[in-house]
Regions:
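Conserved CoA-thioester-binding segment of acyl-CoA-metabolizing enzymes
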Residues: 1-56
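Single conserved hydrophobic/aromatic residue that forms the stacking wall/gate
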Residues: 183-190
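PIN/NYN-family metal-dependent endoribonuclease catalytic core
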Residues: 94
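Hydrophobic/aromatic residues within transmembrane alpha-helices
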Residues: 17, 53, 65, 110-111, ...
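Glycine- (often His-adjacent) and acidic-residue-rich active-site loop
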Residues: 7, 33-34, 47, 54-90, ...
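CoA-thioester-processing core
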Residues: 84, 88-90, 98, 104-158, ...
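Short acidic-hydrophobic, aromatic-tinged amphipathic segments that line or gate anion-handling sites
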Residues: 176-181
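Acidic, divalent-metal-coordinating active-site segment for phosphoryl/phosphodiester hydrolysis
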Residues: 161-167
């Protein structure tokens, strides 16, 4: 299957999905739907044993792009976004997110939908919803505490604090820390 905003392949029993909306890889319901469809396809693919989620450009996913035409055309675009986002969490095969640059807002939610997160020193994470006066999306009020604990999650959710790669690793938000973006090849060794 072909995807408009993704680069995909299967190699050595690994399904690769790369978000391809550089440089910031902002998402909308259409992009999240494409990712969810690929993950569902990989669940059915016998040659695939695990999935690596990454992105082209400067950032993993710097949040939502509410200016995209798809939001203007739908009667309730947020409902569709919610429905597509829920699908990300239903994947049966292990998903590893390789995160460079920003994973902000819903981009953090996309990262949290993965089973493992690999960051580099240049990575930064932020649940910036309160700063923007938005409701926390992507289930981050559930997924973030499960990953970093209640106190760190409250701190991130209520202050919109930015957490850099090394600190993300220290608090458990990232499972592995690569030296730099060019060293984010660790997922293939897992």
């Amino acid at each position: 299957m072909s995807y408009k905003d993704l680069k995909t392949k299967i190699e050595n029993h690994i399904g690769y999905v790369t978000i391809n909306r550089p440089p910031n890889n902002h998402f909308d319901a259409e992009l999240i739907g494409q990712i969810a469809d690929f993950l569902e396809e990989m669940d059915k693919e016998k040659e695939c044993r695990s999935i690596i989620l990454s992105s082209e450009g400067k950032h993993f996913c710097a949040g939502a792009d509410f200016t995209r035409s798809s939001y203007k055309e739908e009667s309730d675009p947020y409902e569709r976004l919610y429905q597509e986002a829920v699908k990300l969490f239903k994947t049966k095969k292990p998903v590893i997110a390789a995160i460079q640059g920003a994973a902000v807002g819903g981009g953090l939610g996309v990262a949290l939908s993965a089973d493992f997160r690999i960051a580099c020193e240049e990575s930064r994470f932020s649940a910036n919803f309160s700063k923007l006066a938005f409701h926390q999306g992507f289930g981050t009020t559930v997924t973030l505490p499960r990953v970093v604990g209640n106190q760190k999650a409250k701190w991130m959710l209520l202050t919109s604090a930015r957490v850099k790669g090394k600190e993300a690793f220290e608090i458990g938000l990232a499972d592995f820390l690569a030296v730099s973006y060019t060293h984010l090849t660790l997922p293939t060794t897992l």
